[in-house]
Regions:
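Well-ordered beta-sheet/strand-loop patches within structured domains
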Residues: 2-5, 23-73, 149, 169, ...
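Sec-dependent signal peptide hydrophobic core
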Residues: 5-14
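C-terminal motif of bacterial Sec signal peptides marking the signal peptidase cleavage site
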Residues: 18-21
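Cationic-aromatic interfacial patches
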Residues: 23-175
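Phosphate-/polyanion-interacting regions in eukaryotic proteins
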Residues: 137-138, 157, 164-166, 182-185, ...
Length: 564
């Protein structure tokens, strides 16, 4: 053999030896699954009853489910093999790092602790003793299991415990446990996690737009959230002081403000936020202060959470009212057929969430005033002015339907209600306008025109007693009739004749009712963030529902068990 050939053999042998050595060293530098399993069991066994924690002050959100999972697995690690993290383990860490793109909050899954622990276990780490310690591998395995169980539950049902919002809701961890078992059968962890997400267009559209929002967002600075509506002035003052310090509008030693100082501070904030400078605090000021990227992201989280809990499938044709947007839309086969501004209930006379079907249209309707309005508005006004009913054009009727003379009633004898119906006759001055859309519901709510059409020019349109006023009522009734399949008549032309009839009734100011055969499904819902025209639209939390969910989410993501 020549020297060149021998040299080649030597080099190949050296490479083989090096590879074998590296593999051997790699195993020795990590640890074996048997040792990790022993440490997992020890970590749990060493805890006092009830076993809701493990060592080193790490935090768990699903302690009971996590412990049960390891008992079922005989304490074998679920994310680690002899050579280190499994592919699924690495995928899960990456998922948690990017969990915002799924509308989830990183802090809910021990991201900081997992990252710190993971860095100690890297082969290029300076923490050689830490890397060789099986207890550290046990810790990260437990943290990953806890995170997985939390993520699957949150992707499936949201952050909020169902029984906190719904009395008849039930919760079962069985499917999350089954998903955990399935991670040992496939390397496609992402598919397992995404299988828990809603498939609805509303959810998926919002999710698709999240990366663009996140790429432009700045989460580097945390700002104090200002509660609204203001229910406690002292709390509000404390919050606005703290918030102002964060923007260097107040010295750090300020702890309280008198009324003049508060007004001057508000003026500073109004100037900075390009608001009208009047020194008065209210809705616009607080909206501007809470308009941070962190709060916008949390609003997205809240609404994706709603979509996870409210998994609805919609028909090909339906009417949609999103209350915070102050808009109505009619969708047909994914296309928007009608869009209209709406006026919704005031915060103290809210429009309820409703699922129903529009089954009647009435021209020049009368208005039978709800008992709640009679108690709160009508009766007090009658007591102040005997001529109130006549001035408003209201009539009253007894239980038998007989008209009653208001002057014959001793109004002072009634405190909370009256044994009469109060009815406003149809006409241009009627509060319902000249068109009403009926749909069965227990709240006596309907869509209608209005005699105060100028209010549609307002940007904030939470102004009604609870019903939904529709600006484009004329387009809506024509769409409903033209798309209706009349009984025993397949000729669409006959629907056109009916539209003409309705126009005739309107011109003649006649009260008529049209029954709809092909009833139009209607959904009245509440979403403060939604996709529209390829971007995320944010809407004001008109009824304070976001605040309720925000508080529940913050409470639910605070871990309930400590690794101590």
């Amino acid at each position: 053999m020549n020297n060149k050939f021998l040299s080649k053999i030597f080099i190949v042998s050296l490479l083989i030896s090096s590879i074998i050595s590296c593999k051997s060293n790699n195993k020795s530098e990590t640890t074996s699954t048997k040792l990790v399993a022993t440490e997992i069991k020890t970590l749990f066994d060493n805890q006092k009853e009830p076993k809701t924690s493990i060592e080193d002050s790490s935090l768990l959100t699903t302690p009971n489910e996590t412990i049960a999972a390891y008992k079922d697995a005989n304490y074998e690690p679920l994310w680690i093999k002899d050579e280190g993290l499994t592919n699924n383990g690495q995928t899960l860490i990456n998922f948690i790092r990017n969990v915002r793109s799924y509308g989830l909050i990183p802090e809910a899954y021990n991201l900081q602790k997992i990252t710190s622990q993971y860095n100690k276990l890297q082969l290029d780490s300076l923490w050689e003793n830490e890397r060789k310690n099986p207890k550290n591998w046990a810790r990260i395995d437990i943290l990953l299991t806890d995170a997985f169980l939390s993520i699957t539950r949150n992707l499936d049902r949201g952050y909020i415990p169902l029984d906190s919002l719904s009395k008849d809701a039930t919760y079962s961890a069985a499917k999350y446990k089954e998903a955990l078992i399935n991670t040992g059968k496939t390397d496609n962890l992402l598919q397992i996690l995404e299988s828990f997400e809603p498939k609805s267009k509303s959810y998926q559209d919002l999710k698709k737009l999240l990366p663009n929002f996140l790429s432009a967002a700045d989460f580097s600075k945390k700002y104090t959230f200002i509660d609204y509506p203001i229910t406690n002035k002292n709390k509000f003052v404390a919050q606005i002081i703290k918030r102002s310090k964060e923007e260097n509008l107040l010295p750090n030693d300020v702890t309280n403000l008198d009324s003049i100082e508060l007004s001057n501070l508000v003026k500073k904030i109004q100037e900075k936020k390009n608001l009208e400078i009047d020194g008065k605090y209210g809705r616009q000021l607080i909206l501007a202060l809470n308009n941070t990227d962190s709060e916008k992201f949390l609003k997205i989280v809240i609404n994706m959470d709603r979509l996870r809990r409210n998994r609805e499938e919609y028909p090909n044709r339906y009417l949609w009212v999103n209350l915070p947007s102050f808009y109505l839309q009619v969708f047909e086969n994914g296309e928007t057929k009608i869009e209209s501004k709406v006026i919704i209930g005031k915060p103290n006379t809210r429009t309820p969430l409703i699922t129903s079907k529009i089954n009647q249209i009435t021209t020049y309707p009368t208005w039978t005033i709800p008992t709640s309005i009679i108690s709160k508005e009508i009766l007090p006004n009658i007591k102040k002015n005997n001529n109130y009913l006549n001035r408003k054009g209201y009539s009253i009727f007894d239980a038998s339907g007989q008209k009653v003379n208001p002057d014959s009633v001793n109004w002072s004898s009634y405190e909370k209600g009256i044994p009469f119906k109060v009815v406003q006759p149809g006409g241009d001055a009627n509060s319902l306008g000249i068109m009403k859309f009926n749909f069965p519901n227990k709240y006596s709510v309907y869509l209608h025109d209005t005699n105060q059409r100028s209010l549609f020019n307002n940007s904030f349109r939470s102004l009604s007693h609870g019903c939904v006023r529709v600006q484009n009522w004329d387009s809506l009734y024509q769409y409903i009739i033209l798309s209706d399949k009349r009984a025993n008549d397949d000729d669409i032309a006959s629907n056109g004749v009916l539209v003409d009839s309705v126009k005739t009734w309107l011109n003649a100011k006649k009260r008529r009712t049209v029954s709809i055969v092909n009833e139009l499904p209607i959904y009245i819902r509440y979403y403060t963030a939604a996709s529209k025209n390829g971007k995320i639209e944010f809407y004001e939390d008109v009824y304070g529902e976001d605040n309720k969910i925000r508080n529940l989410i913050m409470k639910s993501i605070n871990p309930i068990a400590t690794l101590n």
